[in-house]
Amino acid sequence: MEPLHAVMLTVSLFVLTFFNPGANLFVVVQTSLASGRRAGVMTGLGVALGDAFYSGLGLFGMATLITQCEEIFSLIKIVGGVYLLWFAWNSIRHQATPQMPTLQQPISAPWYVFFRRGLLTDLSNPQTVLFFISIFSVTLSADTPTWARLMAWAGIVLSSVIWRIFLSQADRKSVV
């Protein structure tokens, strides 16, 4: 696969995850509704930092794995592809709305409380790391150059920040 195609496919698959409600989406929206837009932005930036960490770990850890042991990488590609198919199937099949946890921080907490909430929500979500490994095992190869990996990482981080800031606007009244 051409490096730019790999970058576009990697970022596109990540962006598709935005439309599947999960813990990261709910923590940003809930915080925005309960504590305001600024708190939601800080929570979203915490989630985006978690995405940056896991995607970087996946992108560059996967590169090491690819070069060291092709058999393990082939197994990860198969398992990753099956996981992505299972994830898509369950997303289509189950349209239930998860329960949102109750907000435990006071409404007027310092910025770092909200940032930490977003970061810990993302880092404690095992689905995040599994999804990144699955995406990278399908879209990257041993030949994918470092610049393409860096572009994919930057695209993931940028799209994560933009999406989380968009979600933090939940406290505003919708305009039809």
Regions found by a protein language model. Give the residues of each.
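Juxtamembrane transmembrane-helix termini in multi-pass membrane transport proteins
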Residues: 2-74, 134-152, 156
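Transmembrane helix irregularities
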Residues: 19-20, 123-124, 162
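Membrane helix-loop-helix hairpins that form the core translocation module of multi-pass transporters
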Residues: 5, 38-114, 170-173
